[in-house]
Amino acid sequence: CGNVLHVHDLADNVTTESERAGAAAAAYALGGGAETDAVADTGCELTVSPAGIAGYALPGRITAVALTKLNFRVRRPVDAACVRILADGEELFAGKVRAFKPSVMESFPLPAKVIQRALDLGVSKIVLSVDPVEEA
């Protein structure tokens, strides 16, 4: 899980992340590597970058083809926006349109099949973009 320091708005987020960090540290100390939920895949090395109104995205790197929880915050409030996952300009996933606020740490479950699709495209970076949409 790496070294992590960022502000959470809920104690639940702090607890969950600290438990994950502790499990990863224990696995690493026992020689099992840093991955706890999935085995690191030597062929999987994806950088995660924010775009649109997303200020940042965590984790910044994905090393396993497994369901991965992405956390992010938006830079400004918006009533209608959509989370999109892009690889080399191609949209791999689009979420439902909904409201976002900068004060809320958002999370997004990135399915393993989306990670695999990015790897199949031969990219080393995916983009988590939160894009405002015009309501009709």
Question: What do the PLM-derived regions correspond to, one by one?
Answer:
Residues 1-136:
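Residues forming the flavin
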